[in-house]
């Protein structure tokens, strides 16, 4: 069954460079860009006005934001492999690069649901898990030089998954700190991974132009979503877990019904790459190479 979405607001030139990450935090949308800024936008008002602009210490730009499920911790990763942990209420931050034990050349990060641990991928293939309050390393897995492009924490806190340049996916048990599954299905870079809200399913996508759905416990593939004609850089489940949002480098945005594994909506308001997507209460939000933020709502939503 098809579902219609409408563009409800476009914030043109929201940043001065590509927008690489979007996260909903404490009632606001956070956007991060190659211009080294993080901006907060109102979710509540129709104009989605700018709430606050933060000049970050990321001198080469910001490409990843991660938020804990309780929304009390935000981690930002920059192109200089610098990592900062933020208090979203006060905007106070600390530089994890000052920790001599911290892995160098960090690329992406994710945070446990309670905000107590942070996991990182790195350009040299390591996956490191750190205690957030103390900044002490809990565990580290070496994937033998395979660039970790993306990472996610399961909402139940039991698993971490990382996607790599080689197409490999590593599912790690947080209880043991060891590999739980090595997931097959991709032979080209995996650029985005996402757990379902119930932590039962995992979506992975990238240069293969398809989205693979896995059963988390068994590691089995349960679906392949085909329809994109270009590299996919972002996937995200909606809060209920019945829909999956995906976006590619040619500006195509798709919504998938997880029960039927079928595409129910396609949007294409820009030809530029979409680097980031996020859900909010009335629909979803996308941003990318054209420096704009687009807000969509379901056609039946007032």
From Swiss-Prot:
One of its GO terms (biological process) is nuclear-transcribed mRNA catabolic process, 3'-5' exonucleolytic nonsense-mediated decay. One of its GO terms (cellular component) is nucleus. WD repeats lie at residues 14-51, 57-96, 101-140, 142-184, 185-226, 227-266, 269-302. It holds the Pfam family WD40. SUPFAM superfamilies: WD40 repeat-like. The keyword Transmembrane helix does not apply. PROSITE patterns: WD_REPEATS_2 (PS50082), WD_REPEATS_REGION (PS50294). Required for formation of the rec12-mediated double-strand breaks (DSBs) that initiate meiotic recombination. Component of the DSB catalytic core (DSBC) complex, composed of at least rec12, rec6 and rec14. The complex interacts with mde2. This is Meiotic recombination protein rec14. It comes from Schizosaccharomyces pombe (strain 972 / ATCC 24843). The lineage of its organism: Eukaryota, Fungi, Dikarya, Ascomycota, Taphrinomycotina.
